[in-house]
Amino acid sequence: MSAENILKVPFSKPSISEEEEKAVIEVIRSGWLTTGKVTLEFEKEFSDFMNSTLDDEKQQVISLAVNSNTSGMILAMNACGVKEGTAIITTPYTFVSTAACAKHLGADVIFCDVEKDSYNIDADKIEQILIENEKTHKADIKAIVPVHIAGNVCNMKKIMMLAKKYNLKVIEDAAHSFPSKTDMGYAGTIGDIGVFSFYATKPLTTGEGGMVCTKDPELAKTMQVMRMHGMDRTTWDRYTSPKASWQYDIVAPGFKFNLPDILSAIGRVQLKKTNDFFEKRKHIAALYNNGFKDVDFVQIPPDSDGNAWHLYLMRLNLEKLKIDRDEFSRQLQQNGIGVSMHFIPLFHFSYWQNLDADFTKENFPNAENQFIRTITLPLWPDMTDEMAYDTINAVIKIGSENHAC
């Protein structure tokens, strides 16, 4: 990249300070690097945060740290009975891991289009799928897997009602939605299980990692055992209790999905900054919304109760432009603005196309319409107002130069 093309506004940068560095060094010097005391403390503190909106002491959130959202989704689906001969319902407008986790377990995926005016799965269309399946008994559906795209929370009231009616589990893919506080509690605590991501670009990061939350002790127990090889004892217990470390049982063919203390140390510091990070994200989003409110070729992103503003999904009114989304993105990058695209619908990928001839953009028009219009703009806590204004000005400049009228 030449000097003139260096990005003035990076798409994303993690907000890491000396506090996180000191926490990591402390773990390194402790002599215990893998999953142990620090991870247990991180899990407790995360649970305390999520429980802060709950009144029922009998329905408290249990948190289990994992090495990625993907790992957490596999644990969650496995605990909910997703396996060969069963199916889940989810959206094609998501990162591939949401659906791939079901395939790893041998299950089928029934895709449901998104709402016309948002990026989230359409609860009314979920209902249509369930009504039809009740007639045909074509699939043994075990779970609905809503994805809170960009931190904008799905219609959980309707989804939970459907789950109760059809005796299904709800597994929230909450990779984008921390902290999304709603009148039903935090996103990720509304369904049977919620799975968060702590990837480098997420609102809370550990570099790589995630957290699984549930209020069901039995589900928690199953996931805890499966998280670490199916052992009936944790690593910390094996090496800190009087009982010999080699005395354990393997009760199931588990996975290796644990989060080490080094990464949990970062997470504990980040968790303390959650509210500050959220306010900064909300501030940048408000600057964008205000800057684009009178721009006819830009549509402001949907905003729900509890929006975490993980991403700012700018939708282009292509009818007002002479260029398409890809060219608009290219020109933004030429102007020094880092951009991305969330997400490429899964029906554009060869693996998923080859599984089902009917899995096409024509059968998921809302997802396709959002895809061809959307550009993800920079949004991160340490962004300055100047960076936001540079982004707004670049969008307006490019749109004005390429206006159709």
Protein language model regions, located:
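N-terminal "arm"/small-domain region of PLP-dependent enzymes with the aminotransferase-like
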Residues: 1-33, 37, 248-251, 378
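Glycine-/small-residue-rich active-site loops that bind phosphorylated ligands and cofactors
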Residues: 16, 34, 94, 117-118, ...
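Phosphate-binding glycine-rich loop
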Residues: 32-87, 101-103, 111, 136
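PLP-dependent aminotransferase class I/II
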Residues: 39-45, 51-52, 56-61, 113, ...
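PLP-dependent aminotransferase-like
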Residues: 78-165, 169-174, 181
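Structural detector of well-ordered beta-strand residues that form the stable sheet scaffold
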Residues: 89, 110, 170-171, 195, ...
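Conserved active-site segment immediately N-terminal to the catalytic lysine
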Residues: 172-205, 221, 246-251
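Active-site PLP attachment segment
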Residues: 189-233, 261
